[in-house]
UniProtKB/Swiss-Prot annotation:
This is MADS-box transcription factor 22. Gene3D superfamilies: Transcription factor, MADS-box. The gene is MADS22. GO terms for molecular function: DNA-binding transcription factor activity, RNA polymerase II-specific; protein dimerization activity; RNA polymerase II cis-regulatory region sequence-specific DNA binding. Disruption phenotype: No visible phenotype under normal growth conditions. Residues 86-176 form the K-box domain. Keywords: Developmental protein, Differentiation, DNA-binding, Flowering, Nucleus, Transcription, Transcription regulation. It comes from Oryza sativa subsp. japonica. PROSITE patterns: K_BOX (PS51297), MADS_BOX_1 (PS00350), MADS_BOX_2 (PS50066). It is found in: Nucleus.
């Protein structure tokens, strides 16, 4: 005949509770000892009765098992902290992915893509955004044009000023210096200084010959009476 299954609930009688506690405590400690022997496990049991009486069992040293438990609990807490950090990073990553997807969608809509699901208000807002963006582009373009024009005007003024300075320097050169400058220019155009001096000497000789010829012609032109 099968034993009737007893309902697990608090025993109301204090005496019956104490008897049941004593019997089941011995059975619990026996099972713990068997588990430690069969499985080579460190087992520790600490039990307080309803009256506050302490009962304990340890397969080895209770203090050693408790120290091992505390060490394991501390290490477990440290190991769980990176897991929490990893969950936080994963949450941030998911949030950034959502923001990236929204920004990509807005960019495609700015290009005129994927507009089918937008309402009239959303389309009007998109139109305003496009107009504002176009206005900023035009302002930036005009600003760059003005900067380029100002730079060209500055360079033109600088060249004009340098040209004026050169003109002033040339106007201050004396005629003799101008002749030297012209001679130097003549030399640089392909003739040596010796050829220049030869040309100048031949010119002076021709001038002297012309003067002598003039004297002869004048002497020949005198009347015969003047010779006496």
């Amino acid at each position: 005949m099968a034993r009737e299954r007893r309902e697990i609930k608090r025993i109301e009688s204090a005496a019956a509770r104490q008897v049941t506690f004593s019997k089941r405590r011995r059975g619990l400690f026996k099972k713990a000892e068997e588990l430690s022997v069969l499985c080579d496990a460190d087992v520790a049991l600490i039990v307080f009765s309803s009256t506050g009486k302490l009962s304990h069992f340890a397969s080895s040293s209770m203090n050693e098992i408790i120290d091992k438990y505390n060490t394991h609990s501390n290490n477990l807490g440290k190991a769980e902290q990176p897991s929490l950090d990893l969950n936080l990073e994963h949450s941030k990553y998911a949030h950034l992915n959502e923001q990236l997807a929204e920004a990509s969608l807005r960019l495609r809509q700015m290009r005129g893509e994927e507009l089918e699901g937008l309402s009239i208000d959303e389309l009007q807002q998109l139109e305003k955004n496009l107009e504002a963006g176009l206005h900023r582009v035009m302002l930036t373009k005009d600003q760059q044009f003005m900067e380029q024009i100002s730079e060209l005007q500055r360079k033109s003024s600088q060249l004009a000023e340098e040209n004026m300075q050169l003109r002033n320097q040339v106007s201050q050169i004396s005629p003799a210096e101008k002749q030297v400058v012209d001679t130097e220019n003549f030399v640089t155009e392909g003739q040596s200084s010796e050829s220049v001096m030869t040309a100048l000497h031949s010119g002076s000789s021709q001038s002297q010959d012309n003067d002598d010829g003039s004297d002869v012609s004048l002497k020949l032109g005198l009347p015969c009476g003047a010779w006496k």
